[in-house]
A protein has these predicted regions:
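GST-like domain detector, emphasizing the conserved glutathione-binding G-site
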Residues: 1-112
Length: 112
């Protein structure tokens, strides 16, 4: 079963959404931000050296960063390509990749 380390008020909500859409069984480990600093709790550093969320554990694979997790989950669990185009459809795949990385590069930076 997949374990998702989920930080309240963060990007890991997109991973929860994806796990639900894919119909995968998963466990959600919820962490809360420090109310004064709004930083992640120190115990997240025990999960991953970056000390941030999201992080998934799937067997012996441990992976951080929401777009990396999205790509991994699609590659591993969506072989029918219900939610993303095949790489041989290069134009559609390139557009998908653009939108996959758009939030990190363009949306969230101005919001911080």
């Amino acid at each position: 079963m997949i374990l998702l380390h989920h930080l309240r008020v963060g990007r890991s909500i997109f991973c929860v959404w994806q796990l639900e859409e894919l119909g995968l069984d998963y466990e959600l480990k919820v962490y809360h931000r420090n109310p004064e600093t709004f930083r992640a709790p120190p115990e997240l550093k025990q999960v991953h050296p970056l000390g941030k969320s999201p992080v998934i554990e799937d067997g012996d694979i441990k992976l951080a960063e929401s777009s990396a997790i999205t790509t991994y989950l699609l590659e591993r669990y969506d072989s029918e390509h219900r939610f993303w185009p095949q790489r041989k459809e290069i134009a559609a795949w390139a557009e998908f990749t653009q939108w996959l990385h758009y939030p990190e590069g363009s949306v969230f930076v101005p919001l911080i």
